[in-house]
Amino acid sequence: MSPKRLLCAAALCLSFAAAGALAQTAAPTAEPAAEPADMPGMESSAPEAPEPPAAPAAMPATPAAVPTPAAPKATAAKAPAAPMTGPVRNVVLVHGAFVDGSSWNGVVAKLQQKGYHVSSVQNPLTSLADDVAATRRVLARQDGPTILVGHSWGGVVITEAGANAPNVAGLVYVAAIAPDLHESTMDLMKRAAPAPAGQAITADSTGFLWLDRSKYHADFAADVPENLTRVLSAAQQPISARAFSETVSQVAWREKPSWYIVTTRDRAISPEVEQFMANRMGAKIVPISSSHLVPVSHAGAVADVIDRAARELSRQQ
């Protein structure tokens, strides 16, 4: 057989095979296709079968009706868990940026002397979500009603973490950022001229912010002994720069009684901004003549505010 005839036969064979496959796909109930005849030039012991009559054209399949999507079922909104009752004897403390949980040491000691069960959260400061998760882990370990306290950036954390938390009886903001719904730290800081401490913050190559050690005392902790501020600045924890632009999706102070300590000599958060936030949330305001690091410089006064808040909440239970 000539090469030309062989190529034509091969093409014809492939066309049959493709048509057979297409028929099987389009009409699964059709009879299996007959075995292909021997290619021309190939020996066969069986007599050549007569060519079958052409099959009638298949009727086009009726397209399946597209099911009408079921109407969504109305679901009742999940009711918030009932708040716990009883005396408030648990305190959870949430630190801010450029410090760690040890910044609460003096407050912890004072509250323990008053008989409270105190826990100090160690925030990773990697994002708002991470800090909220760390705080909620500590809250989950509390047995009974709890007062949640945040300093500085910790105010953003307790605003989110304290919402819909049945064991959180109330909130204390200590020179803290208190955002409203979908509001960020940066949104609030823009309400006043840049604070001196803001000019001392620098970013590293990984996107974390640090407070200049040489300005830590003057701009962050002016009423803390210098030897202690050197230790604090050496142990400072940086915060992710993106955290200051993250917004809250829940607002605890809208559903919980709140207190606010305004630090009148603050060089990190403007006292005017603190006063604005405290007034907006309807908090009970306690001014203290202090630098931003009031949990260190006035640990006793801060502990007294927390104690008074806990006692008042206990009377309301």
Question: What kind of feature is each model-predicted range?
Answer:
Residues 83-128, 167:
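Conserved HGGG/HGGXW glycine-rich cap/lid loop of the alpha/beta-hydrolase fold
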Residues 167-168, 172-213, 240-244, 277:
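Flexible "cap/lid" loop of the alpha/beta hydrolase fold
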Residues 23-86, 315-317:
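Compositionally biased, proline/threonine/alanine/serine-rich low-complexity intrinsically disordered stretches
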Residues 260-262:
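Short beta-strand/loop motif that positions the catalytic acidic residue
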Residues 149-154, 158:
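Gly/Ala-rich beta-loop-alpha elbow adjacent to hydrolase catalytic centers
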Residues 231-252:
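Active-site nucleophile elbow and catalytic-triad environment of alpha/beta-hydrolase enzymes
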Residues 18-20:
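N-terminal signal peptide c-region/cleavage motif recognized by signal peptidases
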Residues 264-296, 308-309:
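Conserved loop-alpha-helix segment in the C-terminal half of the alpha/beta-hydrolase fold
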